[in-house]
């Protein structure tokens, strides 16, 4: 069957491997959503291979995969850590207390040996506020560090900036090599 929508589906599974969550994202536009009946406790994640358990947390699956790509570009094994998408963060309303997202609470329940949480939420006010609230609320359970992207609004923006810089460097090298002939 030929699909006309060009979307990607990020599937989250419970500890038994049963699909319980699915986020949909357009490859050619801004469309994003969740499949009806999705349970946010089981948002998209990638488990580390072995070693001490640490998790890197992102607002979206795209940011988690961008982080994996950045690690690979740096020569590191992205599978040496776990990656968890929250499937977005709830908007804070005036006077409302920000809570720990269900996906992270479930992940910590399923991984009681987790010894570190790295929060790579968006570098905007809602992302920074959520990161502070989450770090504060999980502190009694596990250390959490707030690590927004060094450039751009989110990890995917940072990846694009890194790739653009690498391309500029390659172009400059090609020009320099041509001039040296």
Model regions and ranges:
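Conserved phosphate-coordination/catalytic loops
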Residues: 35-36, 58, 95-99
């Amino acid at each position: 069957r030929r699909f006309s929508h060009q979307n990607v589906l990020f599937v989250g599974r419970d500890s038994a491997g049963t699909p319980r969550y699915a986020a949909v994202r357009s490859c050619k536009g801004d469309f994003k959503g969740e499949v009806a009946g999705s349970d946010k406790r089981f948002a998209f994640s990638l488990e580390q291979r072995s070693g001490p358990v640490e998790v890197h947390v992102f607002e979206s699956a795209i940011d988690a995969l961008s982080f994996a790509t950045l690690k690979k570009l740096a020569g590191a094994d992205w599978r040496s850590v776990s990656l968890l998408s929250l499937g977005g963060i709830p908007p804070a309303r005036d006077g409302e207390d920000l809570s720990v997202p269900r996906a992270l609470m479930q992940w910590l329940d399923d991984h009681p040996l987790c010894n570190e949480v790295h929060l790579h939420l968006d570098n905007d006010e809602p992302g920074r506020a959520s990161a502070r609230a989450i770090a504060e609320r999980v502190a009694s359970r596990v250390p959490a560090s707030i690590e927004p992207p060094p450039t751009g609004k989110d990890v995917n923006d940072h990846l694009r900036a890194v790739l653009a810089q690498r391309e500029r460097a390659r172009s400059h090298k090609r020009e320099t090599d041509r001039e040296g002939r």
